[in-house]
Amino acid sequence: MIPVRCFSCGKVISNYWDEYKRRVTDGEGSAAVLDDLGITRYCCRRMFLSHVELVDVLSPYQ
């Protein structure tokens, strides 16, 4: 699960995650997708680029 807000500036970013993930999986470049979604702050961009989905990895240990 991606955090709801950017850790640095507090901008809501979670509503863009599904669109970002779908478009990058389809082969579009990360920078182009983030530009198109209007994610211009470097702190918010880092949230997308560095995020790793761990829900599937951690769910067996509940």
From Swiss-Prot:
Residues reported to bind Zn(2+): C6, C9, C43, C44
InterPro entries recorded: RNA_pol_su_RPB10, RNA_pol_suN_Zn-BS, RPABC5/Rpb10
The family this protein is said to belong to: Belongs to the archaeal Rpo10/eukaryotic RPB10 RNA polymerase subunit family.
Cofactor: record remark: Binds 1 zinc ion.
Reactions catalysed: RNA(n) + a ribonucleoside 5'-triphosphate = RNA(n+1) + diphosphate
Pfam families xrefs: RNA_pol_N
GO CC term (a single one): DNA-directed RNA polymerase complex
Quaternary structure, from the entry: Part of the RNA polymerase complex.
Descriptive protein name: DNA-directed RNA polymerase subunit Rpo10
Entry annotated with the keyword Transcription: yes
Gene: rpo10
NCBIfam families noted in UniProt: PRK04016.1 (NF003089)
GO MF annotation list: DNA binding; DNA-directed RNA polymerase activity; zinc ion binding
Group of enzyme by EC: transferase
Function: DNA-dependent RNA polymerase (RNAP) catalyzes the transcription of DNA into RNA using the four ribonucleoside triphosphates as substrates.
Keyword terms of this UniProt record: Cytoplasm, DNA-directed RNA polymerase, Metal-binding, Nucleotidyltransferase, Transcription, Transferase, Zinc
Cell compartments where the protein resides: Cytoplasm
